[in-house]
Amino acid sequence: MFRSKRSGLVRRLWRSRVIPERDGGDGNGQSSERNATAVTAEGQRMAQPRRAQEGEGRPVRCCLFAERPGPELPPPPPPPPPGGASPPGPGGGEARSRLVLLERELKAVTYALLKRLKERSLHSLLQAVESRGGTPGGCVLVARGELRLGAARRPPPHLLLGKLFRWPDLQHPAELKALCECQSFGAADGPTVCCNPYHFSRLCGPESPPPPYSRLSPNDEQKPLDLSDSTLSYTETEATNSPNVTPGEFSDASTSPDAVKRSHWCNVAYWEHRTRVGRLYTVYEQSVSIFYDLPQGNGFCLGQLNLENRSETVRRTRSKIGYGILLSKEPDGVWAYNRSEHPIFVNSPTLDIPNCRTLIVRKVMPGYSIKVFDYEKSCLLQHTAELDYADGPYDPNSVRISFAKGWGPCYSRQFITSCPCWLEILLSNNR
């Protein structure tokens, strides 16, 4: 009997799910996109002999059903007497059986959701999952109603697929933020919701450091960074007239005749250490992708910027930029979404401690987004803050983002100009 094409797409999606390396995660809140492994059925079969040698077998734990009550397990057997053999205990077998049951339930509810989708939506979803967001695809809209899993748990569709394909430790829809290009953006109460997991990012709280920044030094979570390098802040004029600017050839759609008629909301400068590479990239659209290599899409391609005699450190860092970031202008401020597979580091006037001689650098893990500039807070700071605390030039509308490499007291690089590859976002006052 022939299987339908839709059934084949559903099976491919199920085999592309993310399986955590550790049961329940590592507890540090780190992005599961770095700590999880996307496996296929073939990969699982190849891993079976090795798992059999590991004793416990490391079964997959389904986070979706973690809170669902199950049968009570018997107490662990007493330890074996010294020199005696360990008696067989039923507890381990029952625990593994329960995990297998939970995995089957997860598969059943996933299939139930995916079989609702049309073939075109399944293609779009599979394209996004297999490219890991390089080709995000279109919106995959489903009714906002929740899926029924017995009487214990009813996850929304976008939460289910977000856990399945990106973040196994995801617990609540409030942790997700729809990207500005998604139809679910700004439509929290709409009748439908997009369930494409690559149309969402995880939120970094503005008042707490993004995970896992505390892993570097628990005592330094709120420790501000020293701003004693007068080259840290540049105005747009200074950046344009910088003697270290090097020419670069790249496609710049922002200079088209139609774009010139509109007002821009920011300029982007790309730096390697103290040298600016290429010209300013002017942004007119609501969002812009800044990347090294992207399978589909347009924006500011850093891979096309040429510079002679690049150091090996810069070359290695450039190779880590990958899909880069998505920078978007939204009603409440400017947001940065980390699309790459490595962390980015952000400094912004609205992330700093007011009236302080130091600044704060935020570490943003892959798959997370952060509000890098808050319009309301910026207006408040410019009316109340004293600028005497700044050492050297200070631009209240400038944001700095370093790829893969941080700076400050936790690193050997004390200043942003010591980072191999970084961006300066020069925001326009005309909002």
From Swiss-Prot:
Highest taxon of the lineage: Eukaryota
Function text: Transforming growth factor-beta superfamily receptors signaling occurs through the Smad family of intracellular mediators. SMAD6 is an inhibitory Smad (i-Smad) that negatively regulates signaling downstream of type I transforming growth factor-beta. Acts as a mediator of TGF-beta and BMP anti-inflammatory activities. Suppresses IL1R-TLR signaling through its direct interaction with PEL1, preventing NF-kappa-B activation, nuclear transport and NF-kappa-B-mediated expression of pro-inflammatory genes.
Where in this chain does the record put each MH2 domain? 265-431
Identify the residues that the record assigns to the MH1 domain, covering every copy.
85-209
Name it.
Mothers against decapentaplegic homolog 6
Q: Where is this region: Disordered?
A: 1-95, 235-258
Where is it mostly found? Answer: nucleus
Per the record, the GO terms for biological process are: anatomical structure morphogenesis; BMP signaling pathway; cell differentiation; cell-substrate adhesion; negative regulation of alkaline phosphatase activity; negative regulation of BMP signaling pathway; negative regulation of canonical Wnt signaling pathway; negative regulation of cell proliferation in dorsal spinal cord
Q: Can you tell me which family this protein belongs to? A: Belongs to the dwarfin/SMAD family.
Binding sites annotated in the UniProt record for Zn(2+): C139, C182, C194, H199
